[in-house]
A protein has these predicted regions:
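Acidic-enriched catalytic cores of C-N bond-cleaving enzymes acting on peptides and small amides
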Residues: 42-43, 67, 74, 88-179, ...
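Short beta-strand/turn micro-motifs at beta-sheet edges
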Residues: 63-67, 185-190
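Alpha-helical metal-binding/catalytic segments enriched in His/Glu/Asp
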Residues: 1-30, 75-79, 92-113, 200, ...
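A short beta-alpha structural unit
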Residues: 201-205, 229-244, 268-269
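Acidic/histidine-rich catalytic neighborhood of metal-dependent amide-processing enzymes
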Residues: 1-68, 329
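C-terminal catalytic subdomain
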Residues: 104, 186-215
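Zn-dependent metallopeptidase/amidohydrolase metal-coordination segment
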Residues: 78-80, 85-87, 102, 170, ...
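Short, low-order "capping/linker" segments at domain edges
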Residues: 239-257
Length: 336
């Protein structure tokens, strides 16, 4: 909505830009039809640059200009050792327990206390943050106290602010999202289940190849327990955008104009599949002008957005459109 109002103000001031708005509504299911849709309408959507407004500031203290997204590689680990539930009193000790075995395999993959992935070669292609990125992290206004409050954490694996930001934005992960198997209702039911499943994902950073990660994880898991079936799901490479150039400078200037402070370059810990599709189909660089704050409950049931950010966002978009128009030749209309 802030971008719409910004476009309205640009139109009222006769700023010479052509603006296309594109809503992507399949993100939470993997955007299965997005790329084919924009490819079929590529001529209509032809553009000089793309701006995505789907990112979060580090804190209210400084505007954030993300320049990268983590990727994602999903997995399903499945293990079946029998045909039906067994009573632990009659078979316990002799029967294999697939839940226990999956937990053992997972503990071999990742250190549950530190989060360090133990699969050989997993970190081989990770590019360390640049000196400028580290300086921006130190000056972005992030605090451990606010991070714990905004996300309602009781404790963290680390408390150092810089280390937290590096882990969330610039390092890959191995996360277990759920384990299914056996009895999960109230009370006690002493069964040994015949099968179990674990849902796992790895967040990836730029320069990591999802297919290589699939190979490394599969070979490692099979080496620990050859009976575990590993299925790869939801492949999405990481994205590294530009931090220099006329369009990046236009966003930077617009954010400073609207919020009174120079934005810091950061990365996002999440993934946006549509970004890679737009870069590929439109052959245009993709930039980010997000406005959400950590306390807005991003993607949570109580997600919200305050009027101060909306007001600043309208001004930022209107000023960005003006700056982009200034990049064109006299009497030309830039396309966004």
């Amino acid at each position: 909505m802030t971008a719409l109002f910004g476009a309205r103000y640009a139109w009222e001031q006769d700023i010479p830009v052509n603006i296309h708005f594109l809503w992507e509504l399949e993100e939470e299911i993997g955007s299965p039809h997005f790329e084919s849709t924009i490819k079929a309408n590529a001529k209509e959507f032809a553009t000089d640059t793309v701006v995505v407004s789907d990112t979060v500031w580090v804190s209210r203290a400084r505007p954030a200009q993300p320049a990268g997204l983590r990727g994602l590689q999903g997995f399903r680990f499945s293990l079946q050792t029998g045909e039906t539930d067994q009573h632990s009193g009659t078979a316990g000790g002799a029967a294999r327990n697939p839940v226990t075995e999956l937990c053992q395999v997972i503990s071999e993959c990742v250190d549950g206390r530190t989060g360090r992935v133990k699969i050989p070669g997993f970190y081989a292609d990770v590019v360390p943050p640049t000196k400028r990125e580290l300086e921006d992290l130190k000056n972005c206004g992030f605090t451990t106290k606010d991070f714990k409050r905004d996300h309602m954490f009781r404790s963290l694996r680390v408390d150092d602010p810089l280390e937290i930001m590096k882990r969330v934005w610039m390092m890959p992960t191995f996360e277990v999202h759920g384990i299914a198997g056996g009895y999960q209702g109230p009370g006690v039911k002493t069964v040994i289940p015949p099968k179990a499943t674990a849902i796992v994902s790895c967040r990836l950073v730029p320069n990591m190849n999802p297919k290589k990660i699939v190979r490394l994880v599969t070979e490692f898991v099979k080496g620990k327990n050859p009976d575990v079936k590993v299925s790869a799901e939801h492949e999405l490479p990481a994205y590294q955008g530009k931090t220099t150039g006329p369009y990046a400078d236009a966003i930077r200037g617009a954010m400073k104009f609207a919020f009174g402070k120079e934005p810091v370059f950061v990365r996002e810990g999440g993934s946006i599949g549509a970004v890679l599709s737009m870069e590929k189909v439109f052959k245009s660089d993709v930039f980010f002008l997000g406005l959400s704050l950590p306390e807005h409950g991003y993607h949570a049931p109580n997600e919200n957005f305050d009027w101060r950010q909306a007001e600043g966002g309208m001004a930022a978009f209107a000023d960005y459109f003006r700056r982009v128009a200034d990049l064109g030749k006299p009497n030309s209309r830039k396309r966004l």
